[in-house]
């Protein structure tokens, strides 16, 4: 079992005092981030990761269902059953607080869907990230009938994924089907044009000036 399983709301409650702040320093970095209403997805999505993300979202809603949260995403997509990612997506749509999503590094496949599922106007990416859309994939073993059942399930998953992407991007399902026949890479600016995100987070003018002053690439 991944050590991520230790980073749930139970760890938060152990250090939390009543309704006001931490009595002691948070027991781990994810708890510290959670105290600031920040959720970080930095691995492929599997059952354990999905369980953690869902628990964090529900916990934050129970804390304050109107106060915004931020989800930072650096993930290639699903490593396991696609139902784990759909469960996270459905939870994001279920909770009532505004959700800002920020891609840093990579948002691929189902992780790109989670990025696009943030609150409109609050879906963002850092400038050097990459976004990839691709079809669900998977292998199947066993009897021919079992392999056929799995193949049909993959087609159903693909159809559902593309329908959800269509909702969040404004693209037609047919267009997304065509675009994802092969790996479909996008820069953050291209992702804005595609409708996956709303803006690219560029360095501030002051920060750019400091970087140029020390000869750093910008």
Swiss-Prot record:
It is an enzyme of class 3 (hydrolase). It holds the Pfam family CLP_protease. InterPro entries: ClpP (IPR001907), ClpP/crotonase-like_dom_sf (IPR029045), ClpP/TepA (IPR023562). GO terms for biological process: protein quality control for misfolded or incompletely synthesized proteins. Its main location: cytoplasm. Keywords: Cytoplasm, Hydrolase, Protease, Serine protease. Fourteen ClpP subunits assemble into 2 heptameric rings which stack back to back to give a disk-like structure with a central cavity, resembling the structure of eukaryotic proteasomes. Belongs to the peptidase S14 family. Cleaves peptides in various proteins in a process that requires ATP hydrolysis. Has a chymotrypsin-like activity. Plays a major role in the degradation of misfolded proteins. This is ATP-dependent Clp protease proteolytic subunit 2. It comes from Gloeobacter violaceus (strain ATCC 29082 / PCC 7421).
């Amino acid at each position: 079992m991944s050590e991520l399983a230790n980073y749930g709301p139970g760890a938060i409650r152990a250090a939390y005092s009543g309704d006001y702040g931490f009595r002691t320093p948070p027991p781990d970095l994810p708890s510290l981030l959670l105290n600031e209403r920040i959720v970080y997805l930095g691995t492929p999505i599997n059952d354990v990761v999905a369980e953690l993300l869902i628990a964090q979202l529900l916990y934050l809603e129970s804390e304050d269902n109107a106060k915004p949260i931020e989800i930072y995403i650096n993930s290639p997509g699903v490593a396991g059953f696609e139902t784990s990612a759909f469960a996270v997506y459905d939870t994001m749509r279920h909770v009532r607080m505004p959700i800002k999503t920020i891609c840093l590094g990579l948002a691929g496949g189902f992780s790109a869907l989670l990025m696009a599922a943030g609150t409109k106007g609050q879906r963002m990416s850092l400038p050097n990230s990459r976004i990839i859309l691709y079809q669900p994939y998977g292998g199947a073993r066993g009897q021919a009938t079992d392999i056929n059942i799995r193949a049909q399930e993959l087609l159903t998953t693909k159809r559902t994924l593309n329908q959800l992407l269509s909702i969040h991007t404004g693209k037609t399902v047919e267009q997304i089907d065509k675009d994802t026949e092969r790996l479909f890479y996008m820069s953050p600016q291209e992702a804005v044009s595609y409708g996956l995100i709303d803006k690219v987070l560029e360095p501030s003018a002051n920060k750019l000036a400091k970087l140029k002053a020390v000869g750093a690439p910008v």
